[in-house]
Amino acid sequence: VATSHLAPQESLKLGKFCSQQKVKHIYTHLMWAPEYSLEVGKQFIEDGGMVELTAVTFGGFVHKRKLAECVEAINTLGAKNLVLSSDTGAVRSMIPSEIFRMFSVNLSNAGVSDDDLNTMMKKNPLAMIAE
C-alpha cells in the first residue's frame, strides 16, 4: 500500500493499520512538501513501513529540494528503509529511465555508496513486490 498524497497524519494512521495487518506499505513523496517531513518519515519507518525518495523532489524537473537534503535523508533514515523512484511519466516530465539514471549518478557523486544505491533501487523495491 502506498500513501500517495494523503496528509501526513492520515499516512501515519494508514501505516500503523498496515503494520497490524502485516501488509507492506510505503510513505511516498517524502519532503515533497514541508509537512512531508523527515520526522514523519522516521515515524513511518518506526511503525514498520518503507519510505520513498523521488528524483522529482530532489533535483527533478521542479527542483523542490537540494540533492544534499536527499543525501541527509538517506544517512538519517538508512538505505535499508528507503526506495528511490523517478516519480515521472507525466507529459511534462522527463523520461523516467533518464531522470532515474541522472538521480543515481548525482547521488553517487554526492557520496552515496553503490551498495546503498543498489539497496534502494533494486533490493528494497523487489522486496516490496515479490517477498
What are the residue ranges of the model-derived segments?
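Histidine/acidic-residue-rich catalytic or RNA/ligand-binding cores of hydrolases
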Residues: 11-17, 36-44, 61-73, 90-105, ...
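Structural preference for beta-strand elements that scaffold enzyme active sites
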Residues: 2, 24-26, 48-52, 81-83
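Short acidic/histidine-rich active-site segments
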Residues: 54, 79-96
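Divalent metal-binding pocket/active-site signature
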Residues: 1-36
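Mid-to-C-terminal alpha-helical segments outside catalytic/metal-binding sites
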Residues: 100-131
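Catalytic metal-binding/acid-base residues of hydrolase active sites
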Residues: 6-7, 31-32, 56-57, 89, ...
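Divalent metal-coordination and catalytic microenvironments
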Residues: 1, 51, 87, 117, ...
